[in-house]
């Protein structure tokens, strides 16, 4: 039977519930347990697919094509379990389902209420998402006390009661601030946060106390006394210089032992040698490179969370410190390519909309003409094709129909038809809704032997995740290929361009898929590893 660990946060948001939860999950997995994780988001959007990156940050795409919260990226980077659409749901998704059932008459004329109908649906989804895992970590988004979170908190209160104390526990993250003028940490915010939880019938079993200063034994003892939490279950989690230290920090305080004993689980001790190796490689690099990341959402770097982590993973696998120089593509439009001088490689990630696109195209031209290693992802591939068409073929009006519907040379256009992972044909038009209508999830990609991308993967067929609605225009592809642009990857049915490479260039690869979604700290990712190797070669050439 599955055991549940419900995770809540108090005092302030952004305490790192996702990282802490994933770190505990990683330790339990290292003990031989099957672990899965769920994220419950209290906003009314059905999913984050149409939300602004400036508000929500990254949209993480699962293997089965769900557009989800970025915390699911943390989950997959810390544990081996592959997340699905069942691992993340929102208030909007729950209400949508309940209202659809009401319209069908499934409730037989009953008055639909938050309790029991909404809470029952939340519980049903939690149980379904947990599947047959030994332990399911269930993270509740937001902060205790928020109105939006109340249905979720009531649902976990009910579920905790229904399955019993031997199968459910509550882990609460809280802030223990350090007051510089007093020279001490303060426990009162934590006491009040737990008081708020207890007022709705939830008593924490574990407190994870976040702080930027050490929390001494006396403070932990005081917290335990005033919150009715065992002293051994009051965990001090100070800021760390890398998030991959967190599993070791939690393990050193016996959190996994407490969980295993509480649930009565029989399992091995934790083998954290893989995490120790990751931390060692991260903190003791032998080389260093600087890579320019040219994007349009630089005001909120969480918009590129998986990509930034993937570059870190590539550094780990190459024993190389990767310094990312974050450059807003609009700054290139205004200030020119001087911003790119001195870098060892250039990375252009995905994005939507016209703003900043010309700056990205200029960055591609700089990389291609100056033989600087280049990796383009999603829009980064599309702008690479546009740049090549403009400056090599001489099609000065070349563009994507996303940015200029009247372009004389629309080298990138809307995908109107494609096969999904099951072989079913999906169609789209300009009139289709924005939400949930992209080419999403894992798709086969056929690689050309002898290409740079094939050298990276060492395979003829790969599977990578997608999130896009525009593609290279096959009608103009013959001229583009004749001019020298190499098509080194195609979709499984051969219909869509997946990877392009520039001719006469040491390392220029652009892909339509999002490889960052499958990169992990322990295994890295072959494409990012190859990119960092190319940057290192470039750096050594300049030395």
Curated annotation (Swiss-Prot):
Explain the regulation of its activity.
Allosterically activated by GTP, when glutamine is the substrate; GTP has no effect on the reaction when ammonia is the substrate. The allosteric effector GTP functions by stabilizing the protein conformation that binds the tetrahedral intermediate(s) formed during glutamine hydrolysis. Inhibited by the product CTP, via allosteric rather than competitive inhibition.
What's a Pfam family this protein contains? GATase
Pathway named in the protein's UniProt entry = Pyrimidine metabolism; CTP biosynthesis via de novo pathway; CTP from UDP: step 2/2
An annotated GO cellular component: cytosol
What sequence ranges are listed for the domain Glutamine amidotransferase type-1? 290-541
Which GO molecular function, any one, fits this protein according to its record? identical protein binding
User: Per the record, what are the reactions this protein catalyses?
Assistant: UTP + L-glutamine + ATP + H2O = CTP + L-glutamate + ADP + phosphate + 2 H(+); L-glutamine + H2O = L-glutamate + NH4(+); UTP + NH4(+) + ATP = CTP + ADP + phosphate + 2 H(+)
Q: Which UniProt keywords apply?
A: ATP-binding, Glutamine amidotransferase, Ligase, Magnesium, Metal-binding, Nucleotide-binding, Pyrimidine biosynthesis
Q: Which InterPro entries match?
A: Class_I_gatase-like, CTP_synthase, CTP_synthase_N, GATASE, GATase1_CTP_Synthase, P-loop_NTPase
Residue positions annotated to bind L-glutamine are: 351, 379-382, 402, 469
Please tell me where Mg(2+) binds in this chain: 71, 139
**Binding residues annotated for UTP, in chain numbering:** 13, 186-191, 222
Which positions does UniProt annotate for CTP binding? 13, 146-148, 186-191, 222
Which residues bind ATP per the record?
14-19, 71
Signal peptide start-end: none
Output the GO biological process annotations, alphabetical, semicolon-separated. Answer: 'de novo' CTP biosynthetic process; pyrimidine nucleobase biosynthetic process
Active site positions, chain numbering? 378 (nucleophile), 514, 516
Name the EC number(s).
6.3.4.2
Q: Where is this region: Amidoligase domain?
A: 1-265
Give the UniProt family note: Belongs to the CTP synthase family.
Miscellaneous: CTPSs have evolved a hybrid strategy for distinguishing between UTP and CTP. The overlapping regions of the product feedback inhibitory and substrate sites recognize a common feature in both compounds, the triphosphate moiety. To differentiate isosteric substrate and product pyrimidine rings, an additional pocket far from the expected kinase/ligase catalytic site, specifically recognizes the cytosine and ribose portions of the product inhibitor.
NCBIfam families xref list: PRK05380.1, PyrG
Question: What does the annotation say about its assembly with partners?
Answer: Homotetramer.
Q: What does this protein do?
A: Catalyzes the ATP-dependent amination of UTP to CTP with either L-glutamine or ammonia as the source of nitrogen. Regulates intracellular CTP levels through interactions with the four ribonucleotide triphosphates.
The protein here is known as: CTP synthase
Name the species this protein comes from: Pseudomonas fluorescens (strain SBW25)
């Amino acid at each position: 039977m599955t055991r549940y660990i419900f995770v809540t946060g108090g005092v302030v948001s952004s305490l790192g519930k996702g990282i802490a939860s994933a770190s505990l999950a990683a330790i339990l997995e290292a003990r031989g347990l099957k672990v899965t994780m769920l994220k419950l988001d209290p906003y009314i959007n059905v999913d984050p697919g149409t939300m602004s990156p400036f508000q929500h940050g990254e949209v993480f795409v699962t293997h089965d094509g769900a557009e989800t919260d970025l915390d699911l990226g943390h989950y997959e980077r810390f544990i081996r379990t592959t997340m699905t659409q069942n691992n993340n749901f929102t208030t909007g998704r729950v209400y949508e389902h309940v209202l659809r059932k009401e319209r069908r008459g499934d409730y037989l004329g009953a008055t639909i209420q938050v309790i029991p109908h909404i809470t029952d649906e939340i519980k049903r989804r939690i149980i379904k998402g947990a599947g047959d895992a030994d332990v399911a970590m269930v993270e509740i988004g937001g902060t205790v006390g928020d109105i939006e979170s109340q249905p979720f908190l009531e649902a976990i209160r009910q579920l905790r009661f229904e399955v019993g104390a031997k199968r459910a526990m509550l882990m609460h993250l809280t802030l223990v601030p350090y007051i510089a003028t007093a020279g001490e940490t303060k426990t009162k915010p934590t006491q009040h946060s737990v008081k708020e939880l207890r007022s709705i019938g939830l008593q924490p079993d574990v407190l994870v106390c976040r702080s930027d200063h050490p929390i001494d034994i006396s403070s932990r003892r005081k917290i335990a006394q005033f919150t009715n939490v065992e002293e051994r279950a009051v965990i001090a989690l100070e800021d760390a210089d890398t998030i991959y230290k967190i599993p070791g920090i939690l393990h050193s305080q016996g959190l996994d032992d407490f969980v295993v004993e509480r649930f009565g689980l029989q399992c091995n001790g934790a083998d954290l040698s893989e995490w120790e190796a990751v931390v060692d490689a991260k903190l003791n690099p032998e080389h260093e490179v600087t890579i320019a990341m040219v994007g349009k959402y630089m005001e909120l770097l969480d918009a590129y969370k998986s990509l930034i982590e993937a570059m870190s993973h590539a550094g780990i696998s190459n024993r190389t410190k990767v310094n990312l120089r974050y450059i807003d593509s609009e700054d290139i439009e205004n200030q020119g390519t001087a911003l790119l001088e001195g870098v060892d490689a250039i990375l252009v990630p995905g994005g939507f909309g016209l703003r900043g696109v010309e700056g990205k195209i200029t960055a591609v031209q700089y990389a291609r003409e100056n033989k600087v290693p280049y990796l383009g992802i999603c829009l980064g591939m599309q702008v690479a094709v546009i740049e090549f068409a403009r400056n090599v073929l001489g099609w000065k009006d070349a563009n994507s129909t996303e940015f200029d519907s009247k372009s004389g040379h629309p080298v990138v256009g809307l995908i109107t038809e494609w096969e999904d992972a099951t072989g079913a044909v999906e169609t789209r038009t300009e009139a289709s809704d924005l939400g949930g209508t992209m080419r999403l999830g894992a798709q086969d990609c056929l690689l050309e032997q002898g290409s740079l991308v094939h050298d990276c993967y060492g395979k003829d067929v790969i599977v990578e995740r997608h999130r896009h609605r525009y593609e290279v225009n096959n009608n103009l592809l013959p001229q583009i290929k004749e001019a020298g642009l190499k098509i080194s990857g195609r979709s499984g049915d051969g219909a869509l361009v997946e990877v392009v490479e520039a001719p006469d260039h040491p390392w220029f690869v652009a892909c339509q898929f999002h490889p960052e979604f499958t990169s992990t700290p322990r295994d890295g990712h072959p494409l990012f590893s190859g990119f960092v190797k190319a940057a290192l070669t470039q750096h050594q050439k300049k030395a």
